[in-house]
Design a protein with these regions (language model features):
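Alpha-helical transmembrane segments of multi-pass membrane proteins
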Residues: 1-419
Length: 419
């Protein structure tokens, strides 16, 4: 709850008031304050530090070694859950940046929702485990629900822009607060269900590891936590920098659903519990949902810009697109004029970047390069902030500058603009 509130308050209040650098400094001082309070409290309680010999090498019995072997599959499950958790957060944040907005406010909403879901899921898991529910059956069902939830969300992503556009003629949706509330609602509906399930899975798996590791519980749980963290790191790196850029968001999400499904299959094949008919029914639902998935997202819908303007802008059919963590979704649209002329428009996450229409936005693009030349005769160094379609950069290049630096939010813009 503290982490979730920190994400929300920082994004909407602290960062706008004091800036990013001061917010980071404030976070450091708060951490130091917490450490100081903990140190003072520990000394005030007169804790006696006793070196407890938890497990001597000579006391490691064959039974303990057998327990460690039995927990090996549990370790793999915990690692996969870590991979799915942070991998799913990475790709969901990417998708929500496309359909809900790519700003510090939007990211705060996403992170707040995800953390609240994890916290609620952990508490729900604690209450259920008190009732002595079979841990492996619980893990199996949670994995099924997670896989099903992930697949079902694939049907909703390209419908979200249309939902935002439906508010175009609503008179009361015209302020920042009202629009942020709607964005927050969308983030909640998309991210909260899988976050709750993941929040349930993690402590349940640790409980299962503890049950399996007779005599070596502390070592087993410590190893499980470490492997879960390794899975978190691999999930961010592999999904964010390999799967997403090269295979797209949809395939990334499907891969994570597969991994969750593998956990379920393992539980059914290698463990005995009475409720297998129920699990097979939900597996059937997953298969049906998967077989009805579209081949890809409808990029014409995703790139309408309704998340920015709460109104649809149709620049034609998407003929090229690139996805990445830094740029979200960059698209090139092609439309045909009545005189058989073809117009191409570049957008990033639905936001207009530029067009090749000479009587339209091409004029400002030319002006951004020509007007500064009226005020200087120097042709040494030039900095262009925002590449767009490359028109302004071309003007300055033709003006004869010796050195030019061009910066933009994403390499995808350079890639598509130069095609």
């Amino acid at each position: 709850i503290g982490a979730a509130m920190g994400a929300l308050i920082s994004g909407y209040f602290i960062i706008p008031m004091i800036g990013i650098k001061n917010t980071i400094n404030l976070a450091v001082w708060i951490n130091l304050l917490a450490a100081g309070i903990a140190y003072i409290y520990a000394n005030s309680q007169n804790y006696i530090h006793i070196s407890e010999k938890l497990l001597d090498k000579s006391s490691t019995t064959q039974s303990n070694k057998s327990s460690l072997i039995n927990t090996s599959f549990s370790f793999v499950i915990v690692m996969i859950i870590g991979f799915v958790c942070l991998g799913l957060e990475t790709v969901y944040v990417h998708m929500l940046a496309i359909v809900a907005g790519n700003s510090v406010y939007a990211f705060s909403l996403m992170l707040f929702t995800f953390l609240i879901g994890l916290g609620l899921g952990s508490e729900l898991s604690r209450q259920l485990m008190v009732k002595n529910i079979n841990a492996i059956y619980f893990i199996c069902m949670l994995s099924i629900f997670l896989s099903l939830t992930i697949i079902l969300t694939l049907f909703t992503w390209d419908q979200i822009p249309g939902y935002f556009a439906s508010f175009e003629h609503f008179p009361f949706i015209d302020s920042f607060a009202e629009r942020e509330f709607i964005r927050g609602l969308v983030c909640f509906l998309v991210m909260f269900p899988p976050a709750v399930i993941i929040g349930c899975l993690y402590p349940t798996c640790l409980q299962h590891v503890s049950n399996m590791a007779r005599g070596i519980k502390i070592q087993a749980i410590s190893s499980a936590i470490a492997l879960n963290t390794v899975g978190n790191i691999l999930g961010v790196l592999i999904i964010g920098f390999v799967i997403l850029p090269y295979f797209g968001a949809m395939n990334s999400i499907i891969l994570l659903a597969y991994l969750s499904f593998i956990i379920c299959i393992y539980c059914i094949m290698f463990h005995n519990f009475k409720q297998k008919i129920v699990t097979l029914f939900f597996i059937f639902l997953i298969v049906v949902a998967y077989l009805n998935l579209p081949k890809n997202f409808n990029h014409n819908r995703l790139a309408t810009g309704s998340n920015v303007y709460f109104k649809e802008y149709n620049y034609g059919e998407v003929i090229a697109h690139h996805e990445s963590l830094d740029g979200g979704l960059t698209t090139v649209h092609e439309s045909h004029m009545p005189n058989d002329r073809t117009i191409r428009t570049l957008q990033t996450n639905g936001k207009f970047q530029g067009t090749d229409r000479s009587e339209g936005e091409m004029i400002p693009q030319l002006g951004f390069g020509l007007v500064p030349l009226l005020h200087t005769k120097q042709r040494n160094d030039a900095l262009v902030i925002g590449y767009g379609t490359g028109t302004t950069t071309k003007i300055l290049y033709e003006a004869g500058f010796e050195n030019m630096d061009v910066v933009d939010i994403s390499n995808d813009i350079f890639t598509l603009a130069n095609k």
